[in-house]
A protein has these predicted regions:
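Surface-exposed, charge/polar-rich loops and edge strands
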Residues: 4-176
Length: 178
């Protein structure tokens, strides 16, 4: 039973005059072709490196990522499993190594899961993204310049930009029952 059915049944049980044509029996939906939709990135900024020096942090990343320095010009992630890191005035490309994610797991294959597990949790010790005060989120509509600004201001120590979720990934997620 989906949420709409449960809510409708609950409302019907609360209504002694239920007829079946009440508004709660309907669910408004809209459909768009997938190729007409755009999903934007959702990025992270972090206040500290969990006691690591920038060099030690970069070294720790190499366990699960291919790390390439990209210079001072803003670097946008190029594909799924590629991340942009901004640290101490430089941009880096981080590409998840094969075997660090499972292509058959619709949640485990997501860049948000990869970055949360292998960077934020494993290296930076951020276990709960919702409550940890050391992390903040920056919507992609604000651009990667906002990430750079927040790090350069000293407010944050590093920024991590993610490639947007693909439409296929979103559709795959919609098919699982969590």
């Amino acid at each position: 039973m989906c949420i709409r059915d449960r809510v409708g049944a609950e409302k019907a049980a609360q209504n002694p005059n239920h007829q079946g044509d009440e508004e709660y029996n309907y669910f408004m939906a809209v459909c768009f072709p997938a190729e007409q939709l755009t999903i934007i990135d959702y990025n992270r900024v972090v206040k500290d490196l969990n006691g690591l020096t920038p060099q030690a942090f970069l070294e720790a990343l190499k366990k699960n990522f291919v790390v390439e320095e990209k210079g001072t010009d803003i670097y946008k992630p190029a594909a799924l499993h590629n991340f942009s890191l901004y640290l101490e005035g430089k941009w880096y490309s981080l590409t998840a190594k094969p075997g660090t994610y499972d292509d058959n797991d619709p949640i485990g294959v997501l860049d948000v899961t990869i970055s949360s597990n292998l960077i934020l949790d494993e290296i930076l010790g951020i276990k709960d993204l919702r409550s940890d005060k050391r992390i903040d989120f920056v919507g992609g509509i604000r651009g990667l310049g906002e990430l750079k600004k927040r790090v350069d201001s000293g407010e944050m120590k590093m920024a991590l930009a993610l490639y947007p979720v693909s439409m296929k990934q979103l559709m795959d997620l919609s098919l699982i029952h969590i």
